[in-house]
């Protein structure tokens, strides 16, 4: 028991310089993957976020919700079609997406943060014209899939100023008041740039970027922007990792200090990344 207590003390001491460095800083967390569907992991993510707030950081949560959307569409007998990883979103699907993300998933995260001792406010990108969007596809084949045109940080600033953690659903609004379904990674990157965040953390279902996915020891701990193009050509950055790396590149070239792709299946992965010397996952830097 004495050893255990000493180990806990050492962990706190190791975290001290990071707590000092990130006091008052903004960290955008893209919350998705297994960490949203596994109850134990979900609770640990909520605890991580609340702890960050209590040690003086300003976490900003952007969430996905693909599995929940799939469940609701299936229940209603609506089939989903995907093109290059994006859900084709017609009017009926858009209505369901907005309902599930803004009305169900968002509020569950807010409730989870409150249950862990924190204070949160759930908002959609439509609130306060937070995320202004336009169609991602000019041909119209993707329906109401959107791209971020502009982020208005005023509402997020007000939420933070009043001591709350912003929890943001990735729904945008167009000039014609049309709702748009936007990839949560893209929204997180755009918000990180707009808020001049020090970190962007993407929770995924993989350890990070792997030189060889079949080799668990081939994790690329640091990825430089200058290396990305070659890695794409070599097939090292492929599949679902392509848009995540692109989001990280957009963020760090837009002024965000560091971006991280980490394994949300690891308990307390956010704390391990931010408050330990070793960190986890892949850090993308503008070098």
Swiss-Prot record:
The EC number(s) attached to this protein equal: 2.7.2.8
Looking up Pfam families in the UniProt record yields: AA_kinase (PF00696)
Quote the subcellular location field of this record: Cytoplasm
Q: What are its GO biological-process terms?
A: arginine biosynthetic process via ornithine; L-arginine biosynthetic process
Q: What is its main location?
A: cytoplasm
From the UniProt record, list the reaction(s) this protein catalyses.
Answer: N-acetyl-L-glutamate + ATP = N-acetyl-L-glutamyl 5-phosphate + ADP
The pathway where this protein functions is:
Amino-acid biosynthesis; L-arginine biosynthesis; N(2)-acetyl-L-ornithine from L-glutamate: step 2/4
Please indicate if the UniProt record lists Amino-acid biosynthesis as a keyword. yes
Per the UniProt record, the site (Transition state stabilizer) maps to: 30, 244
Function (record text): Catalyzes the ATP-dependent phosphorylation of N-acetyl-L-glutamate.
Q: Which HAMAP family match?
A: ArgB
Name listed for the protein in its UniProt record: Acetylglutamate kinase
What phylogenetic lineage does the species belong to? Bacteria, Bacillati, Bacillota, Clostridia, Eubacteriales
């Amino acid at each position: 028991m004495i050893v255990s207590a000493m180990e806990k003390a050492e962990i706190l001491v190791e975290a001290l310089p990071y707590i000092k460095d990130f006091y008052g800083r903004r960290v955008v967390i893209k919350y998705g993957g297994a960490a949203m569907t596994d109850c134990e992991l979900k609770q640990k993510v909520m605890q991580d976020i609340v702890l960050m707030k209590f040690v003086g950081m300003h976490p900003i949560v952007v969430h996905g919700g693909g599995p929940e959307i799939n469940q609701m569409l299936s229940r209603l007998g609506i089939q989903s079609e995907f093109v290059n990883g994006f859900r084709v979103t017609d009017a009926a699907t858009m209505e369901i997406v907005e309902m599930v993300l803004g009305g169900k998933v968002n509020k569950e995260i807010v409730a989870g943060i409150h249950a862990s001792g924190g204070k949160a406010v759930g908002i959609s990108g439509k609130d306060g014209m937070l995320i202004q969007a336009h169609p991602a596809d000019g041909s119209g084949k993707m329906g109401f899939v959107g791209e971020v045109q502009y982020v208005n940080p005023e509402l997020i600033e007000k939420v933070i100023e009043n001591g709350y953690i912003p929890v943001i659903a990735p729904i945008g609004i167009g000039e014609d008041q049309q709702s748009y379904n936007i990839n949560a990674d893209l929204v997180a990157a755009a918000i990180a740039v707009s808020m001049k965040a020090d970190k962007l953390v993407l929770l995924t279902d993989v350890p990070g970027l792997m030189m060889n996915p079949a080799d668990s020891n081939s994790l690329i701990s640091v990825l430089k922007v200058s290396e990305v193009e070659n890695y794409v050509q070599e097939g090292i950055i492929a599949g679902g990792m392509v848009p995540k790396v692109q989001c990280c590149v957009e963020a760090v070239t837009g002024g965000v200090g560091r971006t991280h792709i980490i394994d949300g299946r690891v308990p307390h992965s956010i704390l391990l990344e931010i408050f330990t010397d070793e960190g986890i996952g892949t850090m993308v830097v503008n070098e």
